[in-house]
Amino acid sequence: MYKITIDNMDLKQIAESGQCFRWKQIEEKDNTYKYNIAAFGKSLDISQKGNEFELSCDEAEWNAIWRDYFDLDTDYGQIADKINTSDDDHLKLAYSKGSGVRILKQDLWEMVVTFMISQNNNIPRITKSVELLCERSGIKTDNGKGYAFPKPGQVPEEIFEDRSMGFGYRADYLREIYAFAEANPDWLDNLRKLSYDDAMNTLLERKKKKKKVAN
């Protein structure tokens, strides 16, 4: 168990921001929120009351994985000051609705796949499809509490044919990206090294990877 104080972070706002699909709300009462998060092969329970957070991991795991995941080295207070002193009323209004949102530093492969699933979809359906993909691929997290996100080569072929997964027309695109990444194991590492424009073009080369999703 590890406790920490963090300003400018709201678990509920992050969970509902549409950037992550492996957060499960465990509890919400008396202004306390608790979520389970699966990422990087780990499973974390995290609760929040005000700016106080309690986590199921120890300090070493927090510093090794979750600190960077929650982007704690970025000064969101400074960003807030710039927004609040700007002349942009639309930006101020948007910030007032999501002042606790942080840009999560998620696993690149998970983002590539989940945002393909997100095309022309809604958050509850996306979340369900991602949950089923992880469960039916059967790769356990390190502590055995849940399922890790399947890497290339870890998804049984029949999953792409199973209509109950909710992939719809996206099933063929998912099959293609999994096969491509398995056949080209350096692709993700090379993608990380590219400029924004080159990375965008590389993603758009993949089957039906739309610009909005690639971005």
Model regions and ranges:
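HhH-family (HhH-GPD) DNA N-glycosylase catalytic core used in base-excision repair
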Residues: 1-215
